[in-house]
Amino acid sequence: MKKKKIFIGTIISCVMLALSACGSSDNVVTSKVGNVTEKELSKELRQQYGESTLYQMMLSKALLDKYKVSDEEAKKKVEEAKDKMGENFKSTLEQLGLKNEDELKEKMKPEIAFEKAIKATVTDKDVKNNYKPEMKVSHILVKDEKTAKEIKEKVNNGEDFAALANQYSEDTGSKEQGGEISGFAPGQTVKEFEEAAYKLDAGQVSDPVKTTYGYHIIKVTDKKELKPFDEVKDKIRKDIEQQRLQDTTGKWKQQVVNDLLKDADIKVNNKEFKDTFKFLEKK
């Protein structure tokens, strides 16, 4: 089974289903070099896009069955799209083959439901595990342990950490800022790095820490006092939700897809599409 995309454009899906319902021999195109009938076009579309379309349709049904989306929620998303696109909004609707905003609202409902599904993966345990003090963290990343130890020795001898980061660090995203990691928070770095960082107090520098990226010398430049859990739990939850919505690995999106489609108890009755949901059996 080919790897599935989470959401695929719906316009070809609509065209394909409309044509397949016709099954007509009427010509869609006539030319000197040959004609194309509705039946031929329908067959071609089914072969190329049928599996993806069926997958998307079932995913949308599963999402909207479990996560209800109101017209008001969809309308809000449409208004956000209008503000973002400005004068291009109307032409974009036309390019998508949509007649009006109401049709766009319906198309957006599964995606809104998907956002709700991703957010629902955040548990109370996740929130508790991310209950940690706010910190500002800098680091110097190098490939080998020998170099890391040499740099740590320079830090111990009083050399400026930021200057050393600018000179030696191989993390191009932070070296120009003296090694400072923008927006450091739980769950945003690899486990070894995070555990080492949270053991440090403000002003402390770690020994070399090995991760899959290399060796890090970590410095905590600021560490806030931990606020009461009840004061920050909502913010922690929202932060985790945003992390998962923006996760580029696709881990949380795929987890949602697998769980929803498994629970849907899908049975494919058409041999042409018998392998569409085979990937669920391997999970």
Swiss-Prot record:
Role description: Plays a major role in protein secretion by helping the post-translocational extracellular folding of several secreted proteins.
Name of one Pfam family that matches: Rotamase_3
Subcellular location, principal: membrane
Lineage start: Bacteria, Bacillati, Bacillota, Bacilli, Bacillales
Domain PpiC: 132-222
Name under which the protein is recorded: Foldase protein PrsA 3
Catalytic reactions on record: [protein]-peptidylproline (omega=180) = [protein]-peptidylproline (omega=0)
Protein family membership: Belongs to the PrsA family.
Subcellular location: Cell membrane
Gene: prsA3
